[in-house]
UniProtKB/Swiss-Prot annotation:
SUPFAM superfamilies: Galactose mutarotase-like. This is Uncharacterized protein YihR. The lineage of its organism: Bacteria, Pseudomonadati, Pseudomonadota, Gammaproteobacteria, Enterobacterales. GO terms for biological process: 6-sulfoquinovose(1-) catabolic process; galactose catabolic process via UDP-galactose, Leloir pathway; glucose metabolic process; single-species biofilm formation. It holds the Pfam family Aldose_epim. It comes from Escherichia coli (strain K12). One of its GO terms (molecular function) is aldose 1-epimerase activity. Induction: Induced during growth with sulfoquinovose.
């Protein structure tokens, strides 16, 4: 593949995260890696808006990765579809689950480049655990006024309907400060309780689990690793660090969002993962998409920073 260079953008040679693309627009700078179509860095006025990782290293905790054809977990890596049972590889042994899909560690291809945007594409061939065929595309667009906009699209290019879900795994941060200091606001009034393997059990009102962030509230020592159902299918959440005078917002058009307080990353950021369905949807069927042959699905989200 020939490498294309345009002003304000540079593509590196191959490394652990594939290739690196640098984007810039106004006070925003973004680093995208081709492995997992991942968001490796996003800054605003020099401040980190997501926990970054070095492109030359394999990141922890699925930092910034695109999650296709399912987000989060499938319990025991097993599901039934149209009367047939399928077994996926278990890649999170602590929860005995197949986690975060099949494209998070695949190298995507760069198909379009500009100074402020990049389009990445991937082909997902059939496999024993997921015998369906998808073409996926991620478009990262950086704007000096609105920040980073991302569209994730997949199309079923097979001949039979495919079970499908999608998400993405950014860790929002107020310049790598502790989440304990953040004010967190999320317009979601329902949240799942989980079992000992982190699988969702019962949907509760957020007050029942003491996870009501519909009004901005300090996270403090609260540990969060829960799936929330948002009040609307177009929503915006915000974290704010008052002393840093910095806020980071994410908006999306999906009803579900996984929030994790980042214990694996020293609580330097909050994973906020827009998802088309909750965990284990391949078994529960809740908001599981059945992509007919030729049909597409799109997920949109946007991240931007503000100085208070």
């Amino acid at each position: 593949m020939s490498l294309i260079k345009v002003p304000c953008m540079q593509i590196t040679n191959m490394h652990c995260s594939g290739q690196t693309v640098s984007l810039a627009a106004g006070d925003y700078h973004a680093t995208i890696v081709t492995v997992g179509a991942g968001l490796a860095e996003l800054t605003f006025q020099g401040c980190h808006l997501v926990i970054p990782h070095k492109p030359e290293e394999m990141p922890l905790a699925h930092l910034g990765k695109v999650l296709i054809p399912w987000p989060n977990r499938i319990a025991n890596g097993c599901y039934r579809y149209q009367g047939q049972e399928y077994q996926l590889p278990i890649n999170e042994h602590s929860s005995k689950a197949a986690i975060h899909g099949l494209l998070a560690w695949r190298d995507w291809q760069i198909s379009e480049l500009t100074a402020t945007s990049v389009t990445l594409t991937a082909f997902l061939p059939p496999s024993y655990g997921y015998p369906f065929m998808l073409a996926s595309q991620v478009v990262y667009s950086l704007n000096a006024h609105t920040g980073l906009s991302v569209e994730i699209a997949s199309q079923n290019i097979g001949t039979v309907a495919a079970p499908y879900g999608v998400g993405i795994h950014p860790y929002l941060t107020c310049n790598l400060t502790s989440v304990d200091e953040y004010l967190f606001q999320l317009p979601a009034n329902q949240v799942y309780a989980v079992d000992e393997h982190a699988n969702p059990t019962t949907l509760h009102h957020v007050d029942e689990l003491d996870l009501n962030f519909t009004q901005a509230k300090k996270i403090a020592a609260t540990k969060i690793d829960h799936t929330f159902k948002t009040a609307n299918d177009l929503w915006e959440m915000t974290i704010t660090h008052p002393q840093q005078a910095l806020s980071v917002s994410l908006c999306s058009d999906q009803l579900w969002v996984q929030v994790y307080s980042g214990e694996k990353l020293q609580r330097q950021g909050l994973a906020v993962e827009p998802m088309s369905c909750p965990p284990n949807a391949f078994n529960s069927g809740i908001d599981l998409l059945l992509l007919e042959s030729g049909k597409p699905h799109r997920l949109f989200f946007n991240i931007y920073g503000q100085r208070k």
